[in-house]
């Protein structure tokens, strides 16, 4: 058996939800005028309050104008907040994470992860996770731009990249660019042709 749903003429929600709109008094007046059974079911005998509000609303249009102004301000604030969130999301999606492999002494190297501060990731916690997951030394340091980066000892750039991809995907940032740079590769010397000394 289907039940007919009544929608409020003031806030356009079912009367059960009118109390969440901030227009409860006007909603009660509308419901009392249009569906007294439902009004009695929801609010009981609240007739005196409804009559008082109806009289005041009938006498003064300032209440409606003020309510409309407040509603417009609220809509503007919501639109601003939404656009701010969209800009923040676009900034996060357009930023990139750089995983740089750098040479240390002899054949040792380290991996530096930069660009994660945009995604509100706790760097110290991430460093501890890397240290325990990869069984290696790991620390947080600041680069020349005064931004934090995670320094991991060892040649584990691929494993770190896979972990960061999974971490960003978990946060809902699947389209973020993760770039791997190998600064440890030595430039090959171009062979120079030397002429043997004349004998």
Swiss-Prot record:
GO terms for biological process: formation of translation preinitiation complex; nuclear-transcribed mRNA catabolic process, nonsense-mediated decay; ribosome disassembly; translation reinitiation. The keyword Ribosomal protein applies. InterPro entries: DENR/SUI1_TIF, DENR_C, DENR_eukaryotes, DENR_N, SUI1, SUI1_dom_sf. SUPFAM superfamilies: eIF1-like. Its main location: cytoplasm. Keywords: Cytoplasm, Ribonucleoprotein, Ribosomal protein. One of its GO terms (molecular function) is translation initiation factor activity. It holds the Pfam family DENR_N. Residues 97-168 form the SUI1 domain. PROSITE patterns: SUI1 (PS50296). GO terms for cellular component: cytoplasm; ribonucleoprotein complex; ribosome. The SUI1 domain may be involved in RNA binding. NCBIfam families: DRP1. Belongs to the DENR family. PANTHER family: DENSITY-REGULATED PROTEIN, DENSITY-REGULATED PROTEIN HOMOLOG. Interacts with the 40S ribosomal subunit. This is Translation machinery-associated protein 22. It comes from Eremothecium gossypii (strain ATCC 10895 / CBS 109.51 / FGSC 9923 / NRRL Y-1056). The gene is TMA22.
